Design a protein with these regions (language model features):
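Acidic, proline/glycine-rich low-complexity intrinsically disordered segments
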Residues: 18, 134, 145, 154, ...
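Tandem amphipathic alpha-helical repeat scaffolds
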Residues: 228-242, 271-288, 311-328, 351-371, ...
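Inter-helical turn/loop elements of alpha-helical hairpins
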Residues: 141, 163-306, 310, 321-334, ...
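Short coil/turn linkers that connect adjacent helices within long alpha-helical scaffolds
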Residues: 221-222, 261-267, 301-308, 341-348, ...
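Aliphatic-rich helical/repeat scaffold segments used for oligomerization and domain docking
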Residues: 1-257, 472-473, 479-481, 485-501, ...
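Eukaryotic all-alpha helical interaction scaffolds
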Residues: 219, 238, 258, 283, ...
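Alpha-helical protein-protein interaction modules
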Residues: 426-562
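Tetratricopeptide repeat
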Residues: 215, 247, 251-254, 292, ...
């Protein structure tokens, strides 16, 4: 199908412009045109005719409004140009009134929809009759996905239906219904994030992510309170599915829109505090600790003022985490211990397990194995609480801390055992961020055991995953790990460049090392400099420091053939 579409485009393009040829430069654009026009021969012919005026790249860029591009944007265009619109107009006129109404209202969906969603937007009785008619008349396509029917438009039909919806005056009502449905879906999903049904609900949100984006966009325009609620409900989904930057952007937009609106501040403050906590959590996980700390401070301030203990606990946890990464150790422990005290006084058992796990993590990063007795106490209580929890992730988080604790204590084989088990569980739960994090820990264990090839294979995966996530601090640490291996393999020049590139990235992104990372880095750097001429080292350091992140990653991934 794809090959035939491209062949048709080339034939019609040559008819329109005899100088047209398919090249390596325009081939991706031609393929994109055919894909975005859903392989419809008539649409492809009309697009190819535009090579008289535009390059394939320009045509692809203008496909955002297919009907306007392909018909010249006018109902008085030449008959040949009007063919596509005439075809869709004719199909539309064959529909009865109910089918026409349903066709228009379903244009608010992005990326398809379920029958339940269609009922919410177009009405139960109308959808029952109208949708089946649209399917029978090939205006709507239906697919089976995991035992459920999912419906979609060809994009040209969706744009036509949206035009009709806007003309009808029903667009606002349809979008409001669409928003209400996906706000409700987000609410129902969030209730199951800490249950064994977590993966099924996460997968459902993934399938509806385009619709969620559309609903959020409309909420920002018309209903800022709903936008604020949605970002709170979706924050864990964005975190586990590696939509960290996107999630941060939605949170910032929702908070800004709500704070700039005429909404009653007392009414929205509880949700606003939760939104700041969500922003802090997402920022921390993408390595933007400064933004994370700022958001966490705001959440703490609001939660204290309105006396919302549960939100305060979660905000303090975020403040503790991000402050530890920024080197503000006193604030980190003060925040986490205050959270611990509240949990014990109020009886927040699930949250107590989480703050104890946070204390284990931060204590390890700051004090390493020197605080073994305190770490053991935190771990034992956290493990006992996790075993009584209905949240499947609680046990997995504990397993992860056992792996990290074994790693810091130098028991690398034990660390690997726990990491392997935890990695499998995170994959089962669909938590992609946690998978990347623990693959990194497995790489660290392999490196420290001297299994350099295994470690390098893992680092080659994880450094690109951290880059995609946008966690510049994690990328910098991975570059350092590549450098440590290079030094161990007596590739001093390579090690110097990589360590310098990592240093430059940390400086540019305000991503300091944790105390434990600093100890290893300083030891490696001292050993490297001791075995190298100072003038040569200075030259190599300057070369590495001039690399941007993309260049440094490319250099790290390139095999040393010298």
């Amino acid at each position: 199908m794809e090959y035939e579409s491209v062949r048709l485009f080339i034939e019609r393009a040559i008819q329109a412009n005899s100088q047209f040829t398919l090249t390596s430069e325009n081939a991706p654009s031609v393929a994109q045109i055919c894909e975005r026009l859903d392989g419809i021969p008539l649409a492809i012919e009309l697009a190819a005719a535009r090579v008289k005026l535009f390059t394939p790249q320009q045509i692809a860029e203008r496909l955002g409004d297919r009907l306007k591009l392909l018909t010249g944007g006018s109902r008085t265009a030449l008959p040949r140009q009007q063919t596509l619109r005439a075809l869709i107009d004719w199909s539309y006129l064959t529909l009865n009134e109910t089918e026409q109404s349903v066709l228009c209202r379903l244009a608010v969906f992005s990326g398809g929809w379920t029958f339940e969603a269609a009922e919410a937007v177009a009405g139960e009785m109308e959808v029952m009759d109208g949708l089946s008619g649209l399917v029978n008349k090939s205006m709507v396509h239906v697919e089976e996905q995991e035992g459920q029917s999912r419906y979609r438009y060809l994009e040209t039909i969706r744009q036509y239906a949206m035009e009709k919806l806007l003309e009808s005056g029903d667009a606002i009502d349809a979008r409001d219904r669409h928003l209400a449905h996906f706000l409700d879906l987000s609410r129902r999903a969030e209730r199951h994030f800490r249950t064994p049904q977590r993966l099924a609900w996460m997968n459902q949100l993934e399938a509806e992510h385009d619709n969620i984006r559309a609903a959020l966009s409309w909420a920002l325009e018309s209903d800022p309170e709903s936008a604020l609620r949605m970002v709170v409900l979706l924050s864990l989904f964005w975190q586990s599915h590696n939509y960290l930057t996107e999630g941060c952007n939605w949170c910032q937009s929702a908070i800004s829109r709500a704070e700039g609106s005429s909404l009653d501040r007392d009414k929205i403050d509880p949700t606003r505090a939760q939104a700041y906590t969500a922003l802090a959590m997402l920022s921390v996980n993408r390595g933007d600790h400064q933004s994370g700390q700022t958001a966490a401070r705001k959440s703490v301030a609001i939660a204290r003022r309105i006396d919302d203990k549960l939100t305060l606990v979660r905000a303090l946890n975020s403040l503790g985490f991000t402050s530890a990464f920024l080197g503000d150790i006193t604030l980190a422990f003060d925040s986490l211990h205050e959270s611990e005290d509240i949990c014990r006084k109020v009886g927040y058992r699930e949250e107590l397990a989480e703050v104890l796990q946070a204390l284990v993590y931060v204590t390890m990063e700051v004090h390493g194995s020197q605080a073994a007795e305190q770490l053991q106490a935190y771990m034992q209580e956290s493990l006992a609480l996790s075993q009584r929890s209905v949240d499947p992730e609680a046990a997995v988080r504990t397993e992860g801390l056992l792996a990290r604790l074994a790693f810091f204590q130098g028991d690398l084989a034990e660390a690997r055992k726990h990491a392997d088990l935890m990695l499998d569980r995170h994959r089962e739960m669909g938590d992609q961020l946690a998978v990347t994090d623990h693959q990194s820990m497995m790489a660290h264990s392999a490196r420290q055991l001297g299994n350099f090839e295994e470690a390098l294979a893992l680092y080659r995966e994880t450094i690109q995953e951290w880059q995609e996530i946008g966690h510049r601090g994690a990328v910098a640490h991975q570059l350092e790990c590549f450098a440590f291996i290079a030094r161990a393999k007596e590739e001093g020049e390579r090690a110097a460049k990589l360590m310098s590139a990592a240093e430059a990235l940390r400086e540019a992104s305000s991503s300091p090392r944790t105390p434990q990372e600093r100890i290893e880095y300083d030891t490696e750097l001292d050993s490297l400099r001791a075995g190298m001429d100072e003038k040569a080292f200075t030259s190599l350091w300057a070369e590495g420091h001039s690399m941007n992140m993309e260049q440094a990653i490319e250099y790290a991934l390139t095999e040393n053939t010298s």
